[in-house]
C-alpha cells in the first residue's frame, strides 16, 4: 500500500492508497514544530483502527508547501516505517510535465499535483480552481503543459482581513448564502454576501478571461475544501473533485516507480 501526505498551509492530509483507490484518509492541523515521533503516535493509532499493519505500507510519498515540516515527515517515514520517502518534485518524483512559465521551479507542490492529476483524469484543455488558503487557478493545455495561472486571496483570508482591519464587524462562519439576493438586511448577512459573492464573481470573471486567452473551450475542474460550497451557487464547474491533490500524489508515485 501507498501512504501519501499533502502538507498544506492549514492542514496535513494523509491518505492510504490501494492502487489508485483511497482506502482511508486523515487530517491534522499543520504545525512545523510537530516532531516525527508526534506524527507517529497519531498516525500509527489510526492505522491500527483501520486494521493496517505498518509492514503493509511499501511506499511513501509526500508533498509540502511548508519546508519546515519536511524533516519531521522524513523522520516519521524512516524511523517508523523503514522507508525513505519520495518527495514530490524531487529526484525520481520530479514533475512529469512541462511548465511553459518563467520560473518553473517556483511552482508550489500542491499546484503541481493538481496539474498532474487533472490532466491524467480529465484531459483536454483545462482550468483547475483550488479553493484553499489562497484561491489558485491553473491553465493546462491538451498536451498536459502548464501554461500559467493566478493566485488570489482565499475567501477566509478575505474575511480575516475584513474582520481584522475593522473595529466592530463580527467574526462570521463561511457558508453559502441562503438566498440569491445580494442586498443584505443585517450586518452578518451583508458581510457573508460581500465575501461569498465577491469570491464567486472574481472566480467566474477570471475563468472567462482565461478561457478567452486560451482561445479554445477549456473544462473547469474545482477542488479544495470549499469547492462543493461554491458549486451550489455557480454552474461554471465541469467537475468537482475533492481528492484531486491527494490523488496527484498516487499518480506521481506511479511515475516514480517506473524510473
Swiss-Prot record:
Entries under PANTHER family matching the protein: TYPE III PANTOTHENATE KINASE
InterPro entries: ATPase_NBD (IPR043129), Type_III_PanK (IPR004619)
Organism: Erythrobacter litoralis (strain HTCC2594)
CDD domains named among the record's database cross-references: ASKHA_NBD_PanK-III (cd24015)
Recorded GO MF terms: ATP binding; metal ion binding; pantothenate kinase activity
Binding positions (ATP): 6-13, 133
Pfam families named in the record: Pan_kinase
Disulfide partners: none
Protein name according to UniProt: Type III pantothenate kinase
Phylogenetic classification of the source organism: Bacteria, Pseudomonadati, Pseudomonadota, Alphaproteobacteria, Sphingomonadales
Amino acid at each position: 500500500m501507498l501512504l501519501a501526505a499533502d502538507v498544506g498551509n492549514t492542514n496535513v492530509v494523509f491518505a492510504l492508497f490501494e492502487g489508485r483507490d483511497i482506502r482511508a484518509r486523515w487530517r491534522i492541523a499543520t504545525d512545523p514544530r510537530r516532531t516525527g515521533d508526534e506524527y507517529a503516535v497519531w498516525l500509527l493509532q489510526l492505522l491500527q483502527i483501520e486494521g493496517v499493519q505498518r509492514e503493509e505500507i511499501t511506499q511513501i510519498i509526500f508533498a509540502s508547501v511548508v519546508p519546515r515540516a519536511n524533516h519531521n515527515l522524513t523522520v516519521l517515514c524512516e524511523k517508523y516505517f523503514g522507508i525513505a520517502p519520495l518527495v514530490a518534485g524531487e529526484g525520481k518524483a520530479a514533475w512529469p510535465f512541462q511548465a511553459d512559465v518563467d520560473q518553473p521551479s517556483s511552482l508550489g507542490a500542491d499546484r503541481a499535483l493538481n496539474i498532474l492529476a487533472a490532466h491524467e483524469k480529465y484531459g483536454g484543455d483545462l482550468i483547475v480552481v483550488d479553493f484553499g488558503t489562497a484561491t489558485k487557478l491553473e491553465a493546462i493545455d491538451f498536451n498536459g503543459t502548464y501554461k500559467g495561472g493566478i493566485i488570489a486571496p482565499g475567501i477566509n483570508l478575505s474575511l480575516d482581513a475584513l474582520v481584522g482591519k475593522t473595529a466592530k464587524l463580527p467574526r462570521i462562519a463561511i457558508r453559502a448564502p441562503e438566498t440569491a439576493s445580494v442586498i443584505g438586511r443585517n450586518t452578518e448577512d451583508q458581510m457573508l454576501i460581500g465575501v461569498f459573492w465577491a469570491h464567486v464573481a472574481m472566480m467566474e470573471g477570471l475563468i472567462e478571461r482565461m478561457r478567452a486567452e486560451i482561445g479554445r473551450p477549456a473544462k473547469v475542474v474545482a477542488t479544495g475544501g470549499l469547492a462543493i460550497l461554491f458549486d451550489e451557487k455557480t454552474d461554471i464547474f465541469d467537475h468537482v473533485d475533492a481528492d484531486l491533490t491527494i490523488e496527484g500524489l498516487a499518480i506521481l508515485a506511479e511515475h516514480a516507480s517506473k524510473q
